[in-house]
UniProtKB/Swiss-Prot annotation:
Its main location: mitochondrion. The keyword Transport applies. Binds 1 heme c group covalently per subunit. This is Probable cytochrome c 2.2.
Length: 135
């Protein structure tokens, strides 16, 4: 039983999340486009340091205008909402000048919380400039 944080969008609470389950979700659903342990970008921007960062702000990544202009600061709450339906949260996210974002979201609250827990922990670590994959 983990702590829960407020989920004002649904009136419930965001589950604390499970790091190991989140790591598995990241490998299955996110790692093909994102890294957390490096400053390098892949098809998607690095998620290293994402907590507390404003959307559309990774240097060298070609964001859509919608993502640049959203102005959201990523935290547990905003990630929880975004991960449920990225295209609804930031309309226009799907098109970064050279690829189409295919991630449709995670509908289960527990899966979103697990993924956020993993991202919170690993994205806060000092990045390796040459790391490309999870350990």
């Amino acid at each position: 039983m983990g702590k829960k944080k407020s989920d004002s969008a649904s009136g419930g609470a965001i589950p604390e999340g499970d790091y190991e389950k989140g790591k598995k979700i990241f490998k299955q659903r996110c790692e093909q486009c994102h890294v957390v342990n490096s400053l390098q970008t892949k098809t998607g921007p690095t998620l290293n340091g994402v907590i507390g960062r404003q959307s559309g702000q990774v240097a060298g990544f070609d964001y859509s205008a919608a993502n640049k202009n959203k102005g959201v600061v990523w935290d547990r709450q905003t990630l929880f909402e975004y991960l449920a339906d990225p295209k609804k949260y930031i309309p226009g996210t799907k098109s970064y000048s050279f690829f189409q974002m295919v991630f449709a979201g995670l509908k289960k609250a527990d899966e979103r919380a697990d993924l956020i827990k993993f991202i919170e922990v690993d994205a806060a670590k000092k990045p390796s400039a040459y790391a490309h994959h999870l350990p």
